[in-house]
Amino acid sequence: SSVTGVQTCALPILNIENPTKTAACLFVDKEEIGSMGNTGMESNVFSTFMSDVLNKLGVNRPNLLDKMFCNSRMLSADVDAGLDPIYASVADLHNASFLNKGVGISKYTGVAGKANGSDANAEFVAYIRGIFESNNVGYQIAELGRVDLGGGGTIAYILANKGVDVLDCGVPVLSMHAPYEVTSKYDVYQAYKGYEAFFRS
């Protein structure tokens, strides 16, 4: 349910009393229709909020917001397309995520080859893998589907375009966007552990 999704993302940051670095958890919607509107990631609400923080700290100056984004790291906690055995033809069996194998990490997202995609750099992928492995987080590397058959976008490209290191990292789901979706409790728990480990890093 959406409650489980919010808890999986919100509780890790709430568990940290004194983060070593500035930590934020942002909840946005409208991703399926282009992330538009004041609650979508294309909105300027987050940039305005961060500018206000810099102003209240008395440190804001020209281009500081841009530099802040370029020095930021993000996990885009969108769900991953789990391999559905009934519709296996739309997945790349060697690059699909499976239920009960951990949170899915997608280095690349997009459709039709590389259109509207985001591609995390190898160094950032290695950084996240290191955090997960040192905290015993079960994870799997996956793609969203076969080229030109599956695939899909997330909000990762929006922040990546601002200079943020972004990696898609979410729970594999069967029957995504259907009235009845299926996930694994193990994968949800590994996502929770992974997000908390990331906030603590």
Give the location of each predicted region.
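Acidic/histidine-rich catalytic neighborhood of metal-dependent amide-processing enzymes
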Residues: L14-L99, G104
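Structural signal for hydrophobic packing residues in well-ordered secondary-structure cores
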Residues: E17, M50-G58, D84, R129-F132, ...
